[in-house]
Curated annotation (Swiss-Prot):
The D1/D2 heterodimer binds P680, chlorophylls that are the primary electron donor of PSII, and subsequent electron acceptors. It shares a non-heme iron and each subunit binds pheophytin, quinone, additional chlorophylls, carotenoids and lipids. D1 provides most of the ligands for the Mn4-Ca-O5 cluster of the oxygen-evolving complex (OEC). There is also a Cl(-1) ion associated with D1 and D2, which is required for oxygen evolution. The PSII complex binds additional chlorophylls, carotenoids and specific lipids. Residues 345-360 form a propeptide. A quinone binds at residues 215, 264-265. Chlorophyll a PD1 binds at residue 198. The gene is psbA. One of its GO terms (cellular component) is photosystem II. Keywords: Calcium, Chlorophyll, Chromophore, Electron transport, Herbicide resistance, Iron, Magnesium, Manganese, Membrane, Metal-binding, Oxidoreductase, Photosynthesis, Photosystem II, Thylakoid, Transmembrane, Transmembrane helix, Transport. It comes from Microchaete diplosiphon. This is Photosystem II protein D1. Fe cation binds at residues 215, 272. Its main location: membrane. Signal peptide: none annotated. It is found in: Cellular thylakoid membrane. The record marks 190 as: Stabilizes free radical intermediate.
Length: 360
């Protein structure tokens, strides 16, 4: 009797690595996009934390007046930020090896570029990873489409806007008060509140919040009773159950009578598509608006648009907003220019809309 032993061919290390990377059985899916996403997001996070805590002041305006943003230099969680790279650097790519020393790199705000480039690349890979996992599970690709809205917004404020303005010093600072400063200056220079695409974004965000609250409250109010009065309603649902957990007919009837019939969805699929599409489209438009304002295609200008029969200006709310814009423009970067161009180029503007009567 003879026995034949057949040696099993072993898969190569690369084949086993590929199988592990693309396996949907892992607790957390990695995927090929994840191979790039993980190191880039780790690098961005590590640099952000270190810079937020200990980075030295940055010469953001390029006029040798450094601005401190880290905790060690006296800031707190609210006032602290990773300060954008210097206006002296402009749009130049500024990695560590381009600086003469590490001190120079820190002084010119090099950490800001390191963080935003790795962050944007990592977020883009996260979007690709969403698509990749959906593809491998046989799902439709709309999750990554929805995620493209916040990714477009981040790309607009961190990359497109600095490119349009000619310097990464105009990018959004990485901090709470820095974000507010960016918003105020953006309004002063571009009148974003009167830009139609920003208005669509406001409708998308606030409308999405409203619709989410309406949907959640309607579903919670029309749950199918599966528990007693002494048990939590949440015990009435078992993960993976085939039965509906709420009565969509009851919810449809309630909302249809509360407003009118056709204001209520009678199709669960179209309802949830609407809940996803409304805020996503709104945020898309805002990102597009910021990207156009980056190249100074600004919001509407209704300044001094109402005049009387003798040609005198009748002040409107648009003129009040314009005064606020001018004030904000004067206050920011106050040492970087001799006189704000918006004020120097226009006619003399009185401080008050009407001169007060002084009885002395």
């Amino acid at each position: 009797m003879t026995t034949t032993l057949q040696q099993r061919s072993r898969a190569s290390v690369w084949d086993r690595f590929c199988e592990w990377i693309t396996s949907t059985e892992n607790r957390i899916y990695i995927g090929w996009f994840g191979v790039l996403m993980i190191p880039t997001l780790l690098a961005a996070t590590a640099c952000f934390v270190i810079a937020f805590i200990a980075a030295p002041p940055v010469d953001i305006d390029g006029i040798r007046e450094p601005v401190a943003g880290s905790l060690i230099y006296g800031n707190n969680i609210i006032s602290g930020a990773v300060v954008p790279s210097s206006n002296a650097i402009g749009l130049h790519f500024y990695p560590i090896w381009e600086a003469a020393s590490l001190d120079e790199w820190l002084y010119n705000g090099g950490p800001y570029q390191l963080v935003i480039f790795h962050f944007l690349l990592g977020c883009a890979c996260y979007l690709g990873r969403q698509w990749e996992l959906s593809y491998r599970l046989g799902m439709r690709p709309w999750i990554c489409v929805a995620y493209s809205a916040p990714l477009a917004s981040a790309t607009a404020v961190f990359l497109i806007y600095p490119i349009g303005q000619g310097s990464f010093s105009d990018g959004m600072p990485l901090g709470i008060s820095g974000t507010f400063n960016f918003m105020i200056v953006f309004q002063a220079e571009h009148n974003i509140l009167l830009h139609p695409f920003h208005m669509l974004g406001v409708a998308g965000v606030f409308g999405g919040s409203l619709f989410s609250a309406m949907h959640g409250s309607l579903v919670t109010s029309s749950l199918v009773r599966e528990t007693t009065e002494t048990e939590s309603q949440n015990y009435g649902y078992k993960f993976g159950q085939e039965e509906e957990t709420y009565n969509i007919v009851a919810a449809h009837g309630y909302f249809g009578r509360l407003i009118f019939q056709y204001a209520s969805f009678n199709n669960s699929r179209s309802l949830h598509f609407f809940l996803a599409a409304w805020p996503v489209v709104g945020i898309w438009f805002t990102a597009l608006g910021v990207s156009t304002m980056a190249f100074n295609l600004n919001g509407f200008n209704f300044n001094q648009s109402v005049i009387d029969s003798q040609g005198r200006v009748i002040a409107t709310w648009a003129d009040v907003i314009n005064r606020a814009n001018l004030g904000m423009e004067v206050m920011h970067e106050r040492n970087a220019h001799n006189f704000p161009l918006d004020l120097a180029a226009g006619e003399v503007a009185p401080v008050a809309l009407t001169a007060p009567a002084i009885n002395g």
